[in-house]
Amino acid sequence: MTRQDLASLIRNIPDFPIPGIQFKDITTLIGNGQAFSEVIDRLHERYQNQQIDAVVGIESRGFIFSAPLAYRLGVGLVPIRKPGKLPAATYQIEYQLEYGTNRLEIHRDAFQPGARVLVIDDLLATGGTIAAACDLIEMAGGQVAELAFVIELTFLNGRERLRERPVFSLIQF
């Protein structure tokens, strides 16, 4: 499958979750076994020789791609979650959204010091969530090797916010 084939499987939902937003629905992509496998295969091919120590998935759609990729790479999976979801001691960070603030957490013992961490999320929009996730990873002793996204909304310029970090996206809109 080509990248264009994969992109054609992403459904556009107008006015969700609020009016004016064009939501990129990945359920049609992950519901197609061949396409879902292709996404994981392409990510695995990119990272298999990059000495990644852990894969971080961002709640919640990031988990869909981070878990099978961590398995394929033979490394651990570290979740970054919304507040109150992790049972042990955590680092927390609050970050700005267009319409308020949000918080994320990671376990304090998530990594060995200096671990090379690959961060996976489904979509790069403005970059606010992933920038906060990078700060959490560094608080926990990890080093961000690369940020990987299945989808990038280029018109929102999230990559600019992350310009000091390597960014990869499989599909751009």
From Swiss-Prot:
GO terms for cellular component: cytoplasm. Keywords: Cytoplasm, Glycosyltransferase, Purine salvage, Transferase. One of its GO terms (biological process) is AMP salvage. It catalyses: AMP + diphosphate = 5-phospho-alpha-D-ribose 1-diphosphate + adenine. InterPro entries: Ade_phspho_trans, PRibTrfase_dom, PRTase-like, UPRTase/APRTase. SUPFAM superfamilies: PRTase-like. Its main location: cytoplasm. Its EC number is 2.4.2.7. The keyword Transcription regulation does not apply. Signal peptide: none annotated. Belongs to the purine/pyrimidine phosphoribosyltransferase family. Homodimer. This is Adenine phosphoribosyltransferase. It comes from Chloroflexus aurantiacus (strain ATCC 29366 / DSM 635 / J-10-fl).
